[in-house]
């Protein structure tokens, strides 16, 4: 009796394995194809530009991303579906009424962006959802109350002055500056002093250069991964050349944050041994360590690591982006720069002292800062995965399961809500004009239930940096190297942000 085809197959396990793999692959392709058809049906009320069947709208990313948004908003006023590859779609929202409904809900972060950011930042406030997010936010909230923020102003001022001292040395040889490099080091110095009680100046000893390099590369690779649908798969990404580089920098980041935590634990042990009665200011890291010691079940070592990573990253990278673009705008528009300088000089004199009370007494400078944040919002978009259906004000609906991007850049440049959106006009934010702005048309720090917990910290640092910088330097743009905005988790420039600096007489 001849063996059956099944017996023949069983006699060749390698062939059986190949058949099994092909069957699983076919099953996955069918599943993805069915999901694609479901998404197309779900989005039939929302027209979109033609997409390649395999690459999707890849031609929009990343170089032409911001140019394309302007064209899309004219043709698709509220929102537009954008495809990344054949099976991944992001529903990009640029209408404030749409954004308002979305940001008042409690939908979780989108699966793809959540996974990519979590792979190096960890499960902290930026990536958490639900009850755990609420718990963590409650834990860190005391670190951002008004009394704490007032103390931070002195430390921020020290860091800014240190940066400006370095500028004086630099421009003696070369008046050209690349802002992001200098400002990033300054904001890291500031967050390390304010949140982690770091002694000394990072700007002088350059001990954190490796950390800055790691964050820069991890941000860049994360954005590239987001735009490459093949790299959405963890296994494919892990064995890619980018995945190998990512792993190296991620390890460096982890080692650094671990050292920050361990150093503080050792410092606290030493203080206990010395039985010192001298009171020390509690900082952000103290709050986290206290939460861990009091409730190890709800706040683990991994949670501690994640929040340290989150606040080191968010506390310096987003703020350095904001300050760099603000200084660039003021360099580009000298009449506004001079008006800010006059206002600050009248308020602060030589700038030897800047206090909490001063920050509310610079209205024109504040308007300029807001207009810069409108034009160059540090965070380009916010992602959500709809966990229940939604109906928008115009009657169109989406089912649960759709990934939504609230496109902050596009919201801030939407010609239906901003007159001449590309024009730098600080008077948009004057007292009388502010009342006319849709509350969800300007959201540089998000809005609604999950707004940025550190937004007041960021605004204070922006004001301190701008005030002290303009008192000492006149800035002018380097027209030979105009910046090229690019999204790398936060908004940066592909070729840096170059200006000329001249000492104020």
Curated annotation (Swiss-Prot):
Its cofactor is heme. Belongs to the cytochrome P450 family. Pfam families: p450. CDD domains: CYP4B-like. It is a single-pass type II membrane protein. Gene3D superfamilies: Cytochrome P450. It catalyses: an organic molecule + reduced [NADPH--hemoprotein reductase] + O2 = an alcohol + oxidized [NADPH--hemoprotein reductase] + H2O + H(+); dodecanoate + reduced [NADPH--hemoprotein reductase] + O2 = 7-hydroxydodecanoate + oxidized [NADPH--hemoprotein reductase] + H2O + H(+); dodecanoate + reduced [NADPH--hemoprotein reductase] + O2 = 8-hydroxydodecanoate + oxidized [NADPH--hemoprotein reductase] + H2O + H(+); dodecanoate + reduced [NADPH--hemoprotein reductase] + O2 = 9-hydroxydodecanoate + oxidized [NADPH--hemoprotein reductase] + H2O + H(+). Its EC number is 1.14.14.1, 1.14.14.130. Heme binds at residue 452. Residues 1-9 are cytoplasmic. PROSITE patterns: CYTOCHROME_P450 (PS00086). One of its GO terms (cellular component) is endoplasmic reticulum membrane. Keywords: Endoplasmic reticulum, Fatty acid metabolism, Heme, Iron, Lipid metabolism, Membrane, Metal-binding, Microsome, Monooxygenase, Oxidoreductase, Signal-anchor, Transmembrane, Transmembrane helix. This is Cytochrome P450 4Z1. Preferentially detected in breast carcinoma tissue and mammary gland, whereas only marginal expression is found in all other tested tissues. One of its GO terms (molecular function) is fatty acid in-chain hydroxylase activity. Its main location: endoplasmic reticulum. The keyword Heme applies.
């Amino acid at each position: 009796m001849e063996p059956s085809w099944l017996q023949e197959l069983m006699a060749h396990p390698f062939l059986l394995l190949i058949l099994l793999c092909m069957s699983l692959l076919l099953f996955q392709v069918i599943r993805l194809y069915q999901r694609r058809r479901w998404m197309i049906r779900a989005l039939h009320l929302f027209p979109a530009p033609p997409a390649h069947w395999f690459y999707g709208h890849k031609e929009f990313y990343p170089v032409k991303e911001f140019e394309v948004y302007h064209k899309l908003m004219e043709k698709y006023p509220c929102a537009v579906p954008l495809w990344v590859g054949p099976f991944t779609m992001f529903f990009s929202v640029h209408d404030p009424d749409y954004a308002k409904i979305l940001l008042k809900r409690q939908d979780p972060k989108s699966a793809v962006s959540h996974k990519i950011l979590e792979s190096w930042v960890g499960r902290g406030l930026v990536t958490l959802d639900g009850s755990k997010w609420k718990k963590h936010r409650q834990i860190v909230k005391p670190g951002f109350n008004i009394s704490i923020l007032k103390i931070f102003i002195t430390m921020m001022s020290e860091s800014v002055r240190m940066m400006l001292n370095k500028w004086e040395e630099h421009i003696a040889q070369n008046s050209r500056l690349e802002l992001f490099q200098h400002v990033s080091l300054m904001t890291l110095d500031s967050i390390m002093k304010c949140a982690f009680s770091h002694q000394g100046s990072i700007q002088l000893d350059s001990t954190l250069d490796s950390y800055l390099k790691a964050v820069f590369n991890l941000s860049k690779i994360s954005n590239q991964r987001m735009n490459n649908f093949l790299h959405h798969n963890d296994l494919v990404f892990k064995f890619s050349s980018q995945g190998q580089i990512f792993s190296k920098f991620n390890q460096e980041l982890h080692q650094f944050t671990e050292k920050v935590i361990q150093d503080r634990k050792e410092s606290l042990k030493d203080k206990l041994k010395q039985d010192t009665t001298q009171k020390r200011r509690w900082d952000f890291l103290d709050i986290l360590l206290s939460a861990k010691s009091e409730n190890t079940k709800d706040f683990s070592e991994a949670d501690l690591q994640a929040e340290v990573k989150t606040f080191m990253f968010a506390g310096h990278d987003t703020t350095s982006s904001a300050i760099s673009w603000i200084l660039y705008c003021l360099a580009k528009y000298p009449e506004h720069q001079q008006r800010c300088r006059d206002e600050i000089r009248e308020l602060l004199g030589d700038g030897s002292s800047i206090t909490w009370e001063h920050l509310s007494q610079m209205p024109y400078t504040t308007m300029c800062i807001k207009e810069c944040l409108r034009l160059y919002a540090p965070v380009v978009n916010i992602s959500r995965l709809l966990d229940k259906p939604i109906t928008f004000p115009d009657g169109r609906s989406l089912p649960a399961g759709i990934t939504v991007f609230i496109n902050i850049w596009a919201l801030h440049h939407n010609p239906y809500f901003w007159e001449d959106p590309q024009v730098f006009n600080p008077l948009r934010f004057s007292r009388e004009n502010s009342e006319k702005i849709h509350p969800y048309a300007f959201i540089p720090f998000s809005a609604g239930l999950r707004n940025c917990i550190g937004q007041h910290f960021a605004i204070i640092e922006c004001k301190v940096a701008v005030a002290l910088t303009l008192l000492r330097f006149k800035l002018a743009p380097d027209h030979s190297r105009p910046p090229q905005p690019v999204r790398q988790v936060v908004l940066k420039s592909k070729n840096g942000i170059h200006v000329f600096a001249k000492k104020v007489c």
